[in-house]
């Protein structure tokens, strides 16, 4: 896990691997893929988890408790399958996604007093929302 902000990046990594039966590895991979398919909206483009989990809670639970699943701005939508995913239902523009992120943050703050922190990093200009 990488924490903090800034321009740090990985330039190398060391791995310690041990031999394993390929059938067992494939079985684990399939199980992992099935869990992902059951819990994440893989049929739509997204950037994955939008918000970090606040201490002692889950961003998805807070978003769902705020009744924001399915909220849409244009083609950007809070996934009805996993509330911490914003999906692109076609031609979502960056402005729509940014506005939806800001709205979710504000609603969760208003209802629960918790400020959700983005997991993603926006690169480039941020539009006025």
Task: Enumerate the language-model features and the residues they cover.
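Phosphate/pyrophosphate- and phosphate-bearing ligand-binding catalytic cores of soluble enzymes
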Residues: 1-99, 107-129
